[in-house]
Amino acid sequence: MDLTQIQNPSFLKDMSISELEGLSEDIRKFLIEELSQTGGHIAPNLGVVELTIALHKLFDSPKDKFLWDVGHQSYVHKILTGRAKEFGTLRQYQGLCGFPKRCESEHDVWETGHSSTSLSAAMGMALARDLKKTKEYVIPIIGDGALTGGMALEALNHIGHEKTDMIVILNDNEMSIAPNVGALHNVLGRLRTAGKYHWVKDELEYILKKIPAVGGKVAATAEKIKDSLKYLLVSGVFFEELGFTYLGPVDGHDYEKLFETLQYAKKTKGPVLVHVITKKGKGYKPAESDVIGTWHGTGPYKIESGDFVKPKEVAPAWSAVVSETVLKLARTDERIVAITPAMPVGSKLEKFQKEFPDRMIDVGIAEQHATTMAAGMATQGMKPFLAIYSTFLQRAYDQVVHDICRQNLNVFIGIDRSGLVGADGETHQGVFDISFLRHLPNMVLMMPKDENEGQHLVYTAMQYEDGPIALRYARGNGLGVHMDEELKAIPIGSWETLKEGTQAAILTFGTTIPMAMEAAERLEKAGVSVKVVNARFIKPMDEAYLHDLLGKNIPILTIEEACLIGGFGTGVVEFASENGYHSALVERMGIPDRFIEHGSVTKLLEEIGLTTDAVVDRIHTMIPSKQKRA
């Protein structure tokens, strides 16, 4: 079948099971081929082909509302709703988004990117439906990994209490990104092997009521028997206790069983949870055999071999520099523990986990819990290293404020994927952390200019015992610089002059330092002398350095790959104003006041005007005397 000719899912209504099975093969082949060129979330989508087709066949989108938790598994949904022809642009600038996008299709009723939000949003839609007295199905699809998130459990509790009509699809592949952890995962494991409790209890009631005269009474008396049967057949039926009708587990790759179960769910009043067992990566051997999450989301790859197509790496990944330095220090300090919310592979903590399994804690998709747990460990003299992506740290903001900073606890937060991350787009850009951490009392915030300084700042953080300290580091690789063998502590709040200059100054840090240095060199050739400063401590700032610099009365440009509002540049302007300097001398470059879409980091930087050319032009406009343009 030519998938690019699909306009909407209505064609599925008249297809036979054998035809649907052929469509499944076509979709898997299409995904494997297309994603080999663009990269993307290949394994999750290969696992939900039959489930997605079954949902679109039996329900009527967009009237009936599908909410894809996290959203990375929505590619099949996009194909069935007329977007197959756009897959060549997947996750590219102004191309097809890798997550549901409301402006992209009327079938995308809820935007996602972070986990565990679908149930709460579905509850809101269902309540709105009931208040408006309309009739449509609301169907959140959530994975077993996302179900470990506290927000999802809060929503389950509320939905079950209110007895709201809703069909929750639990897509259980025993794996979110990395293997799942936690007691709820174990409950699901028991359910997988328990068989279909709900079918048995309903058939029992039907048979009892067929007995003449006494059948109804026997059936009523049997209610307690059914409750006992529930525990006998389904050990630990968590969802029934919350007020859901539990259906399953059902084979998520068997159309007959999917249709039977979903049709039953459609007729059932109140909240229903359909437990679907799927195989992540189904249909592509390298993805099927992956047990650690390598094929969850990938770049381009070679279909035949399963080898990833990667540029030759000339420098270590930032995540590896940080995690391996923490591991090195942990060998001589038993107080150091590493904590991750379900991202051990992404944060490069596999080596730490292998060497110190008792001191490596993966809490699952539970950022709030991870953060407060780290605080609790710090009260007992441990040195917790909390490795967390910038975008996911947003989810633990109150815990950082209330539990870490307020108590001034020695927690080292490694803020991975800081700055623009590219293809994952709006939901994953790490551009807000400076603004929401800089104003917190007791917080120290740093970002290194290269991987050598990065390892020294990790050492600095582990030596620091006066409160919380956080290190920002980017996605991708470092610069390939020489790495010192001996680690050293860098004085807290100290900046570094990278290039002397007399006519203007650039204050920046991290990934924008090469941009600033290149701009300064070009300006130098044009006769403009520009100082470049490595402002590696975003907080506290080097106040002595700032006093000296502002006292020279020269233009100052701050550059940051983070949002301007409340950012580093704002801090410099505030310092100038509060200390009687001419704050108009300070201008800022950074992320504007909007969400940044998906695309390559290079393209996105060009789009927002954060380039070497833009820096050169800005410095020219800031210097009063006319200069030859570089």
Curated annotation (Swiss-Prot):
Binding site for thiamine diphosphate: 72, 113-115, 145-146, 173, 284, 367
Subunit structure: Homodimer.
CDD domains (alphabetical): TPP_DXS, TPP_PYR_DXS_TK_like
Name of protein: 1-deoxy-D-xylulose-5-phosphate synthase
Organism of origin: Bacillus cereus (strain ATCC 10987 / NRS 248)
UniProt catalytic activity: D-glyceraldehyde 3-phosphate + pyruvate + H(+) = 1-deoxy-D-xylulose 5-phosphate + CO2
Cross-referenced InterPro entries: Dxylulose-5-P_synthase (IPR005477), THDP-binding (IPR029061), Transketo_C/PFOR_II (IPR009014), Transketolase-like_Pyr-bd (IPR005475), Transketolase_BS (IPR020826), Transketolase_C (IPR033248), Transketolase_CS (IPR049557)
UniProt key word Magnesium: yes
PROSITE patterns per UniProt: TRANSKETOLASE_1, TRANSKETOLASE_2
Pathway(s) per entry: Metabolic intermediate biosynthesis; 1-deoxy-D-xylulose 5-phosphate biosynthesis; 1-deoxy-D-xylulose 5-phosphate from D-glyceraldehyde 3-phosphate and pyruvate: step 1/1
Binding-site list for Mg(2+): 144, 173
